[in-house]
């Protein structure tokens, strides 16, 4: 995983499995795939993104790994929860997320020039929209074509 990327389901399975000190064969056996080479191969395929487990199997994997199934779910999450998991992924993937208290508020410090530049551009566009220097259509056009 590159800095700032989010983890896919397979990467999350691998992260938690390793964190739990579990071998692929062990996880395969716990979820009913058998503990031999076939089970290990299936888990490897899930972790490497070659196959995606269906929701019922994701439930079994979540139970075996002792985690909330929402962490592995491919179903829609709320925007806020998507952001939470994205921040967790960034933190694991080498883009440290610092939490700072300032004036009684908790703030995120992503300590990344790309985000600083982006936030400045976005703040300027929002100010331009508010002052009617640009139209709502111009603002939407900027957002959907943003390249960083």
Where are these regions (language model features)?
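Short alpha-helical DNA-recognition segment
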Residues: 21-45
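Charged, low-complexity interaction regions
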Residues: 133-136
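Helix-turn-helix DNA-binding elements, focusing on the entry/boundary residues of the two helices
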Residues: 13, 24, 40, 55-58
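Residue-level detection of the helix-turn-helix DNA-binding "recognition helix"
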Residues: 18, 32-33, 48-50, 77
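Charged, helix-prone or intrinsically disordered regulatory segments positioned adjacent to compact structured domains
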Residues: 52, 56-130
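A short, Lys/Arg-rich alpha-helix, primarily the initiator
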Residues: 1-20
């Amino acid at each position: 995983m590159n800095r700032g990327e989010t983890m896919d389901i397979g990467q999350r399975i691998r992260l938690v499995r390793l964190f739990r000190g579990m071998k692929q064969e062990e996880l395969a056996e716990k979820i009913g795939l058998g503990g031999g080479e076939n089970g290990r191969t299936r888990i490897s395929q899930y972790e490497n993104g070659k196959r995606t487990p269906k929701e019922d199997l994701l439930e079994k994997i979540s139970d075996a790994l002792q985690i909330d199934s929402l962490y592995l779910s491919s179903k829609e999450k709320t925007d806020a929860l998507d952001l939470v998991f994205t921040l967790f992924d960034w933190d694991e993937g080498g883009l440290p997320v610092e939490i700072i208290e300032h004036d009684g508020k908790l703030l995120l410090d992503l300590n990344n020039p790309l985000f600083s530049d982006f936030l400045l551009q976005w703040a300027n566009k929002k100010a331009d929209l508010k002052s009617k220097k640009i139209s709502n259509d111009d603002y939407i056009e900027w957002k959907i074509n943003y390249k960083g």
